[in-house]
């Protein structure tokens, strides 16, 4: 009986090892010089200020905790329009839906989780971006960690550049998204 369990276990491990080496041997290495897809978009954020209910695209659902001068603890949800140019009234190609929160006690820093949801005839699905957003820096690189639809299991880098800030009410971010692992 013990010998039979040993043989079955050995066969199972052999099949498992064979499958894993087969999958790994067909993986294509990333070519960082040439992404398989690239998008340049503009995200437009209009913060809710108590009066602009119809125009707001983001709102704080948890206000700062008062632990410093850098909005520590503030949690913001958003549903922002995305356009191909800097004009917020241009045709929307996608929406960024998700949240970010301020987690820096000694400087302005946010951590975000966003889905770039495409609503065009050219692309269907969403890209998922998450990570540290040191938004006081001129450019920030965040990982594209997956997606749905046309972007299922994709990976890449989203470079954010703050394009315009109008006080605490409006900001625009240029997003340069390069995908290095594409399946569709």
From Swiss-Prot:
Extent of the signal sequence: 1-25
This protein's record includes keyword Glycoprotein: yes
Main location group: secreted
Positions glycosylated per UniProt: 55, 119
GO process annotations (BP): phenylpropanoid biosynthetic process
InterPro entries hit by this protein: Allene_oxi_cyc_Dirigent (IPR044859), Dirigent (IPR004265)
Tissue: Expressed in root vasculature and meristems, cotyledons, flowers, siliques, and leaf trichomes. Localized in the interfascicular/vascular cambia and developing xylem.
Family (UniProt): Belongs to the plant dirigent protein family.
Functional summary from the UniProt entry: Dirigent proteins impart stereoselectivity on the phenoxy radical-coupling reaction, yielding optically active lignans from two molecules of coniferyl alcohol in the biosynthesis of lignans, flavonolignans, and alkaloids and thus plays a central role in plant secondary metabolism.
PANTHER family named in the record: DIRIGENT PROTEIN, DIRIGENT PROTEIN 12-RELATED
Protein name, per record: Dirigent protein 13
Organism: Arabidopsis thaliana (Mouse-ear cress)
Gene that specifies this protein: DIR13
